[in-house]
């Protein structure tokens, strides 16, 4: 597909012109410009699609079983361990990895790093998908998902950390949908919608910074609910929120690096030259950002240990594991 940019460089219009000079219809765009036979062949020869089919074949029946027979039918949750794998990994794992959206949005829209613009949309898409699936995981692992709106409307609980997380994640998900909307409007050739979103992009970015910073820190503060279940070397009541926030910075940047590398390797036929030519250069730039974030994380980690007087724990077995983690996962990268 040919891609051309009209005179207004701030509003690139992707028309995807057909070889005969016509414009692709929405239906043809959905089929990626391929015939049904070509699309089917492309689908079947992609090994990732077969892996997804296998995952869905196992996961969908379990998901239906969870909703028809209850949470206990598919998990080993208890009152001592009420949060399962979906909630533990989906919320505390996916949300930091999804920080790429507000990080790249801040860099490009606020700090003027236009050299990072070619990968900004990829970062925004990563963030949107990560937060969306975090909400999906939450609906799966919460005992009564039909009451998910209670902390937002009926039983507010403004003094609770979970109230902050619920409101901010839901609001930030809406902000991310708006931030990625210009890409959809380009695809649908609706320029008025794109111009409107572009006109409020600074406000959306600032809202994303505020919301993401607060709920990333709030997720770290959730560990203060159960301090006895976390080893002192990994727990510091005064610094827990900033530990989580700093880890989200290098996790989000690392996610963009991996996604860009995968796109360049396996989806080059769908990427324009501007993106492909910028991947290596921006990988180095994001790598430097990760290094600074890791240094900051390590310093704050040591400050937390010193503040809580936990040096003696470093001589225990868990202390050796902690030092190994810091060496392999922080110092070496």
Locate predicted features.
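N-terminal signal-anchor module of multipass membrane proteins
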Residues: 2-100, 104
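Juxtamembrane/interface segments at transmembrane-helix termini
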Residues: 4, 66-76, 108-116, 120, ...
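Cytoplasmic juxtamembrane interface segments
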Residues: 19-35, 97-116, 175-191, 255, ...
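Membrane-interface segments at the starts/ends of alpha-helical transmembrane spans
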Residues: 36-45, 65-69, 79-87, 152-161, ...
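Long, contiguous internal "core" modules enriched in hydrophobic/ aromatic residues
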Residues: 55, 59, 115, 153, ...
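Membrane-helix interface motif
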Residues: 63-75, 139-149, 216-228, 302-306
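Membrane helical hairpin/interfacial module
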Residues: 81-146
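Intramembrane catalytic core of multi-pass membrane enzymes that act on lipidic substrates
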Residues: 118-181
């Amino acid at each position: 597909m040919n891609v051309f940019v009209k005179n207004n460089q701030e509003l690139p219009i992707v028309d995807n012109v057909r070889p005969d000079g016509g414009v692709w219809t929405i239906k043809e765009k959905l089929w990626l410009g391929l015939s049904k036979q070509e699309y089917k062949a492309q689908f079947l020869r992609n090994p990732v699609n077969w892996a997804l089919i296998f995952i869905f074949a196992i996961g969908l029946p379990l998901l239906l079983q969870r909703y028809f027979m209850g949470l206990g039918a598919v998990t080993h949750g208890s009152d001592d361990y009420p949060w399962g794998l979906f909630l533990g990994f989906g919320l505390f794992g996916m949300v930091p990895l999804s920080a790429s959206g507000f990080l790249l949005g801040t860099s490009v829209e606020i700090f003027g790093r236009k050299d990072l613009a070619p990968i900004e949309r990829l970062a925004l898409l990563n963030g949107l998908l990560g937060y969306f699936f975090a909400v999906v995981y939450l609906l799966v692992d919460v005992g009564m998902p039909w009451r998910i709106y209670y902390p937002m409307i009926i039983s507010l609980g403004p003094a609770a950390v979970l109230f902050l997380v619920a409101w901010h994640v839901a609001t930030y998900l809406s902000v991310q949908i708006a931030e990625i909307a210009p890409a959809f409007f380009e695809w649908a050739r609706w320029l008025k919608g794109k111009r409107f979103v572009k006109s409020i992009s600074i406000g959306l970015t600032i809202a994303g910074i505020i919301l993401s910073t607060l709920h990333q820190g709030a997720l770290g503060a959730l560990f203060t609910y159960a301090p006895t279940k976390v080893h002192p070397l990994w727990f510091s009541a005064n610094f827990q929120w900033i530990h989580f926030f700093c880890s989200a910075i290098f996790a989000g940047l690392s996610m963009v690096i991996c996604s860009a590398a995968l796109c360049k390797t396996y989806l080059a036929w769908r990427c324009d030259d501007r993106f492909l030519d910028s991947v290596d250069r921006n990988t180095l730039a994001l790598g430097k950002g990760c290094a600074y974030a890791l240094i900051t994380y390590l310093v704050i980690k040591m400050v937390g240990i010193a503040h809580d007087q936990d040096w003696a724990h470093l001589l225990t077995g868990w202390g050796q594991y902690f030092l190994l983690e810091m060496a392999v996962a922080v110092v070496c990268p």
